[in-house]
Amino acid sequence: MQQYFIKGQVENPVIIKDKDTVKHMFNVMRLTEDDQVVLVFEDGIKRLARVTDRENHVFEVIEDLNDNVEMPVSVTIASGFPKGDKLDLVTQKATELGAQAIWAFPADWSVVKWDGKKLAKKEDKLAKIALGAAEQSKRNHVPEVRLFKKKGEFLSELDNFDKIFIAYEETAKAGELATLARELAKVESGQKILFIFGPEGGISPSEIDAFEEAGGLKIGLGPRIMRTETAPLYALSSVSYALELNK
C-alpha cells in the first residue's frame, strides 16, 4: 500500500496541500474515491486513510496502525563532504537502513567545496531523496538531512550524543575488530549514536583529536577497507543486527 508523509499534525478529514504530494497521489498514482493509503504525520504514527474527494484532495482517516519500524536507538550518520553524487547514495540507503539523521561537513581532506547556494541546493536534493526512500521503506519518520557550512558547527553538536564512533582506516589496518561490537552490546534503547566518516582522503589527525576530545571512539569496520559511501551502510547494518536481529 502506498505511504505518504504529511506535514503538520493529524486532522480528520485531511486535506493534502503540498503540490508535489498532490501531483504524485492524483496524477502519477491516479488515486480516486475510496482508494486507501497510509498517511504519516509528524507524530510518526501511521494511519490508514481513504480518498473521499479527489478534486479537493481530501482523505478520511480510518484508523491508527500499530506499525513502528524505527530502530530502538537514534543513529546519525556524519560524513566529510565526498566527491560527486556519493551523498545521494548514502542518503537513500541510510534512510532504508534506519538512520534518523544524515549529516555532512567540510572535512580537512574533502576535495569538494560547496558555497552557501550550492549547499542549500544539495541539501534540498538530499531531503527529497530521503523522503522518497522513507516512503518506499515504510519508515515512521523521514531522516533529517543537514549539511554544515563550517566544521565548527558540526563539532558543536557532538555533546548531544551518548556514543560517538569514528570510522578510522588506520584502526582497521591495525586489526582492531572488537570495539564496535563491544560498545553496541552496551547501548540502551533511546540513546543517540553518531558515526563519523571521512571523505575519500580520510580523517585528518587534527580531526581525530577533536572527535576524541568530544568522547569519540575510533573503530574499525571489519578487516577490509571500504569506500566512503560504503562504510556508513556497513555501520547501520551492524547496529540493526546487534539491536534488532540479535535480540
Q: Where are the regions that the model predicts?
A:
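RNA substrate-binding interface of SAM-dependent RNA methyltransferases
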Residues: 68-166
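Short, acidic/turn-prone active-site loops that include or flank metal/cofactor-
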Residues: 65, 171-172, 223-226
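N-terminal positively charged helical leader segments and presequences
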Residues: 1-67
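Structured adenosyl-cofactor binding patch, chiefly the S-adenosyl-L-methionine
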Residues: 204-247
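Active-site/ligand-binding-proximal alpha/beta "capping" segment
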Residues: 164-202, 206-207, 216-219
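Mobile, glycine- and charge-enriched loop segments
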Residues: 37, 66-77, 184, 188-189
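Generic structural signal for residues in well-ordered beta-strands
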Residues: 59, 142-146, 218
